[in-house]
Amino acid sequence: MKPWHRALYGHWYPVARADQIGSRPQAVSLLDTHIALARTASGGWIALEDRCPHRHAPLSAGCVSADRLACPYHGWSFDAEGVLRQVPGLPEEGALPNVRVRAFAACQFDGLVWLRPGDAGADQPNALVRATDPATRRFQWHTCWPANVVDAMENFLDPMHTHFIHAGLVRRDARRVPATAHFQSTREGFTVDYAGGPSQSGLLYRLFESRRTAERAHFAAPGSTRLEYVYANGSRVLIDLHFTPRTVEATDVFVSLHVEGRWAPTWAVRLLVWPFLKRVNAQDVDMLRRQAENKRRFGQRRGASTELDIVTGALERFWTSGELAQGVQRRELQLML
């Protein structure tokens, strides 16, 4: 039995950076669905199940000619709809077998290739993704975390671990300040506004930021998350992480950094900011790996939670039931951040 709720297949997920997909097919996976992805000669996308129906060779090892994907074993070629168009060696008068490969809807937003693993569902990715201006993007990166998608997303959206896992870089446990978190559900997920903390106690804030007027966390189903920082000078920084589960224990993470209203050329971000962000990522990956190993060691047990775990319930609900909360939900809590 598949571990994923059927409703999850109707959503869109990023599977690759668009600048890294050309005419040479690549194998990608989401929700335990294996797909061959390539760019066609006309600039479109071809996304087919990574299995030729002839002798089950991987289509991702094949090649693209014009707008068709050819199998590496016997050359059977299929169009973007998965229809068989050619069998090399078959006489012209010979009839093509009535077979096809499962095809997947694909599109591009904010420099990423998005796929919908289900035959039906949403027409396009969520509004958070569609509203993002690619012209403000300063950095993009793809990695894979050794974690369940809920654990991975909670890690990014949860500020309470930063005093320990990222001690000194993001926050310091000895320099907590009172803050208020306002949780509100939305049509696509939820937002959490943090008030009372115009600055952070870590090195990253001191080096690269100025006084904040707003700090907000976003979740838009299925796997889009954002940390939004608004500054007193009118500028804004968006750190977007889009999560795509390959399997129950491995999650692709697509990172985009957007900067609005302040000087931040791409070269400066890569040279000055990226080394620190890479360190933060390594710290998170190390803890997520330890967490996953310990879950396997002790078996799946439900974790104890407090009101500080403000995002966990909504994430678990969506990924287990495929549903968001009904109606508008609001709650507020006090915390030492």
Language model features by range: what are they?
Residues 44, 123-337:
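C-terminal catalytic domain of Rieske-type non-heme iron oxygenases
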Residues 4-9, 14-137, 189, 257, ...:
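Rieske [2Fe-2S] iron-sulfur-binding domain
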